[in-house]
Amino acid sequence: IKITGDAVIKSAVGGGGGAGIGGGQWGNGTVTISGDSKIESALGGGLSAGIGGGAVGNGTVSISGNATIENAQGGKDGAGIGGGYGYGQSGTGDITIEGNTTVNATGGMGSAGIGNGTDAGGNNGQITIRGTKDSSPTVNATGGIAEEDGQGYVGPGGAGIGVGSTTDSEYTP
C-alpha cells in the first residue's frame, strides 16, 4: 500500500483480524507513507496493528517526507505501527521513520507502540528512526497496557518502541 502526495485519510478501521491500514488476518502488511500525506486515525481490528500487519502478520512500514500520523492505535495485541499478534511465529515490525515526519502511535494491550505485536515468538523486527540534514522526526510512542488472561494472571505491557509482551499464564506479578 502506498500513500503519497497530499493524500489525507480521515479514518481507517480494521475489521476482525485486519489492520487499519495494511494486512488482513494472517496477512503481512507493507505500507509506504510519504510526501505530505496525513493519516488522521488508523485503528487496528482485534489482534492487528493500526498500520502494518494483520492478526498473525508482520508489518513493514516506511514513513518519510513530511508525512503526519496523528493516531495509529493497535487493536488488542497489535502494535500501533508494526506487527499484529504473532501467535509465536510472526508479529514483527520492520519500521523506518525519517525526515520531517510526525508520528503518534499506541500499542494495543501488551504490544509495542512502534514495533512488535504480542507473542512475536522471540522474533525481532528492525526499527530505524533518523533525521536528515534538514529535519528530524517527532515520534510519540506508547506501549500497550498489561495483559490479563482472565484467570488473574497479568503479564507485562508492551514497550513504547520495541517489542510486545509474551503472554504466559505462568507469569505472576
How does the language model describe each region?
Residues 1-13, 21-43, 51-73, 81-107, ...:
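Surface-exposed loop/turn motifs in large extracellular/passenger domains
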